[in-house]
Regions:
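Active-site catalytic microenvironments in core metabolic enzymes, especially phosphate/sugar-handling
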Residues: 13
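Conserved phosphate- and dinucleotide-binding cores of soluble alpha/beta proteins
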Residues: 16-142
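Short active-site oxyanion
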Residues: 5-10, 117-119
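Active-site catalytic pocket residues across diverse enzymes, especially alpha/beta-hydrolases
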Residues: 1-6, 21-25
């Protein structure tokens, strides 16, 4: 839930996130252009990446398909690599939002190393031993 009085600017390539944020009066929404992936309703490609390069977000919340302490963040779709890399490169801090089932998994295309994240947030129970593998790599684990 987003508090009604939260004032911020959201830069996104996701139409779903843009819609949710647009319902809050205090949130300014900037949508990146590019090629539309209809399955996820996100924009991707070089146009989106070039637009993202014009911004320097304080904080980037990155949804994660697969993450591993050794192999970093990986995704199954090559079209998403450039926009994700650019958002990570441009941001001061990057927080990974991870379903516990995605921990210690690897997909086809590497986006970044684990060291590119400052924090990992998960929405479920994670065994202490698994969490330690990420903490030992320097991540805050919430």
């Amino acid at each position: 839930n987003i508090p009604d009085n939260l004032k911020l600017t959201v830069l996104t390539n996701s139409y779903s996130i843009a819609h949710v944020c647009s319902l809050k009066e205090q949130i300014r929404v900037i949508i990146l252009g590019g090629d539309l992936l209809k399955d996820s309703m996100t924009t991707v490609g070089e146009v989106a990446a070039a637009q993202a390069a014009a911004y320097h977000p304080d904080l980037c919340f990155m949804g994660v398909y697969a993450i591993h302490p050794e192999y970093g963040m990986t995704i199954p779709y090559p079209e998403e690599v450039s926009i994700k890399r650019q958002l990570i490169r441009s941001s001061s801090r990057v927080i990974a939002l991870v379903n516990p089932a995605k921990l210690n998994t690897v997909s086809r295309y590497q986006v970044c190393g684990i060291e590119d994240f400052t924090t990992l947030i998960t929405d479920g129970h994670v065994p202490q031993e698994m969490a330690s593998r990420y903490k030992n790599r320097g991540l805050d684990f919430l």
